[in-house]
Amino acid sequence: MGGSNALNEMTNGSDGITGGVADVYGEEFATQDQLVTPWSFSVACGHSLLRDPQHNKGLAFTEKERDAHFLRGLLPPVVLSQELQEKKFLTTLRQYQVPLQKYMAMMDLQERNEKLFYKLLVDHVEELLPLVYTPTVGEGCQKYGSIFRRPQGLFISLKDKGRILELLRNWPEKKIQVIVVTDGERILGLGDLGCQGMGIPVGKLSLYSALGGVCPSACLPITLDVGTNNQKLLDDEFYIGLKQKRATGEEYAEFVQEFMSAVKQNYGEKILVQFEDFANHNAFELLEKYRTTHLVFNDDIQGTASVVLAGLIASLKLLGGTLADHKFLFLGAGEAGTGIAELIALEMSKKTKAPVEQMRKKIWLVDSKGLVVSSRKETLQQFKLPWAHEHEPITTLIDAVQAIKPTVLIGTSGKGKQFTKEVVEAMANINAKPLILALSNPTSQSECTAEEAYTWSQGHAIFASGSPFDPVEYEGRTFVPGQANNAYIFPGFGLGLIMCGAIRVHDDMLLAASEALASQVTGEHFIKGLIYPPFKDIRKISAHIAAGVAAKAYELGLASRLPQPADLVKFAESCMYNPTYRSFR
């Protein structure tokens, strides 16, 4: 072949060019102190094709494909269908007893055979979602240093300040549509995991592709490593990040500013940047700072708010009345709690035509120091001030429940076992059907379990949680707990922004997403006490959410893809990534 002759001339000739396989500086011949060139071929075939996760089909390569791409002899003779590969992998996966082992097996598959990974996720989402995302991903992040095998995503550290654009250009895929970025300071309910928080952007983008149909090659997970204040990690010899305390203040702000500018310069105006698991003090500031200049979305603030609002809208079929007829009490006044509260107030304002400020008075927050009230204004963080209402100080949740008498209790505290028997019983005494949402992740940090909610309320509670719980048998009835999982919202929300070429995120798009999700809950679901539709229908749900978001973007003049498609649901479905194997020439 001409290519091999050229390579021979280059490596064996006397023109001084080095780095070829046969050259003294080639990897097989060079001594440890000599430099080598990592040669590779651009066209994947043979051995390299089997190690290319985007194109590898494993034993599903046909006889014709094996001959055409030099795979003959590199694989056992059997040819399997993708369906049989799914069955084989699931059989092996189900033999593992430890969820972390299953998580690692799924991550290995993603690095080996991308299409099979996503086909499995799409076809078995209810079984596999808890493995690739909450709650198992939390343990995966905690142990990321010791289970780290191949790098996934882009790691940008303080050492790279001044070169971030160069790092973005190192990423092999050029047509990026969505970035999920974290600085690892508040990973789920687990705190500061530093660089090991990369498991979250990787997991989130897996769901963008599996549930929302965004092409995997258009997704970029990024960790901004600004250090960690977790002493355990700093002392861990296997920790993969910068071993220094977190950068703060001006140093941090300049670093993030360079990153955001580089992203826009490299990928353009319509690149979606999702902020993920930033600490409260940074999350609000970053969203506020960049929402007018970039297409940005914070899932912890906006995604959580949208999915919870959807559950509340759907629950009205069970509770009766309108949102404005209810009273809400939050345990937790951080980014999730205040984000949900603000979207609820906005929705009530839109429906009643009353000012948002008036609607906020129906919503009460409890933080670590007690009920958020006006007498505490001097010491409250800025984002809590809109929720500081006139009331005498109250320090405990049970006293707040008895004083406020809420119809809806929402937990976003990040601390487990906060909804005690006394609290749940009080909610059941106040309401015929108390709505209890224990949203903190992972499962160990949930404010109460499904069994506790149903048992302590004597079967009267309508319950949903952030992490999954099994159905509960109580006095001859089977209660199916709902899961207020952000995965209902953000994949379809992102697809909607991408498919219409949105240039900014508007709060009305979040309301549209909530209403689209709530519309997918049917009478059959309500009979079971569900306020969210089953996850098995997630691609259909995502298409409707995407259509709702895109329609609102067109209405607000924030969409750049023109003309507007006639049927946005069908258009969303046509845009979705298909993980079924393609035939090769």
Swiss-Prot record:
TM annotation in the entry: none
Gene that specifies this protein: MOD1
Taxonomic path: Eukaryota, Viridiplantae, Streptophyta, Embryophyta, Tracheophyta
Catalytic activity field: (S)-malate + NADP(+) = pyruvate + CO2 + NADPH; oxaloacetate + H(+) = pyruvate + CO2
Required co-factors: Mg(2+); Mn(2+)
Record-linked SUPFAM superfamilies: Aminoacid dehydrogenase-like, N-terminal domain (SSF53223), NAD(P)-binding Rossmann-fold domains (SSF51735)
Family: Belongs to the malic enzymes family.
Annotated tissue distribution: Leaves.
Protein name as catalogued: NADP-dependent malic enzyme
